[in-house]
């Protein structure tokens, strides 16, 4: 998910034009508990790709504190970053078999956000 996207973007920046992460963890899932709670992954500090986070506000598996810290770390370095939170949406709201009406709307909205984000940053002549 999100962590592997940032990991790839940090290791191969010329190969990653933009990131759109649903439910993205911004810390190595194998990192120690203190790191998972109190810091962002070191890779976040190397990212130059525009980054879009899309998360459901009912996704309780995410460490939101890391997403917030990653957002601010990217912003402070001048990396284009946006955070979209979807009210009433649970983890994997974009493809749940048991999606609520709100999650179905959130999934449609998220698809449009991702399409626009990628058009803007991957294909700038067509996306602007």
Predicted regions and their residues:
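Conserved hydrolase catalytic core segment
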Residues: 7-17
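Short secondary-structure capping/turn micro-motifs that flank functional sites
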Residues: 2, 25, 90-92
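C-terminal catalytic histidine-bearing segment of alpha/beta-hydrolase fold enzymes
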Residues: 68, 75-128
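The feature captures the conserved acid-bearing segment of alpha/beta-hydrolase catalytic domains
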Residues: 18, 24-85
């Amino acid at each position: 998910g999100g962590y592997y996207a940032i990991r790839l973007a940090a290791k191969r920046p010329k190969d990653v034009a933009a990131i759109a992460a649903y439910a993205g963890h911004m810390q190595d899932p194998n990192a120690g508990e203190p790191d998972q709670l109190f810091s962002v992954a070191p890779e976040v500090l190397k990212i130059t790709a525009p980054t879009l986070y899309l998360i459901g506000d009912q996704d309780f598996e995410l460490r939101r504190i890391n997403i917030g810290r990653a957002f601010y770390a990217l912003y402070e370095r001048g990396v284009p970053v946006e955070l979209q939170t979807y009210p009433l949406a649970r983890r994997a709201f974009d493809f749940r078999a048991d999606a609520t009406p709100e999650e179905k709307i959130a999934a449609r909205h998220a698809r449009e956000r991702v399409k626009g984000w990628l058009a803007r940053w991957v294909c700038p002549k067509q996306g602007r």
